[in-house]
């Protein structure tokens, strides 16, 4: 067994090759001792930017695609052009920070298949695993506890 990172060929499924301006990230999820359908994976694409030089926002979308005939999902990140507001900075030291795309993209947790994500070269991918907590019951509200909105004839 080798310690090299997995490649698309390791999974014996016809995942597409990355485009010329894309890179491919593969996330291998650990098997969970309880029901995996209770977990979610949040994909967090973004860019690493110099902090202090400009205030930047990034926007983009995560699109799900399916390998025809296999039913395996993969995800394609599309980034919009960077929007920045320049600020003056006197320091020569410019720290960097990760600026995530503000949309939340959750996918089903499945340790049997890799999470395959294609993203532009200048984009970084991070992810978070959301775990279940105890379910809480919500009691219905009685009608007298609701506010009434009066309609005015105009």
UniProtKB/Swiss-Prot annotation:
According to its UniProt entry, one GO biological process term is: symbiont-mediated suppression of host complement activation
InterPro entries per UniProt: Ecotin_C (IPR027438), Ecotin_sf (IPR036198), Prot_inh_ecotin (IPR005658)
Write down the Pfam families for this protein, in alphabetical order. Answer: Ecotin
A single GO cellular-component term on record: paraflagellar rod
- Care to name a GO molecular-function term for this sequence? serine-type endopeptidase inhibitor activity
Q: Which SUPFAM superfamilies does the record cross-reference, listed alphabetically? A: Ecotin, trypsin inhibitor (SSF49772)
- What is the superkingdom listed in this entry's lineage? Eukaryota
Q: Which family does it belong to?
A: Belongs to the protease inhibitor I11 (ecotin) family.
Name the chain's protein.
Ecotin-like protein 2
Species assigned in the record:
Trypanosoma brucei brucei (strain 927/4 GUTat10.1)
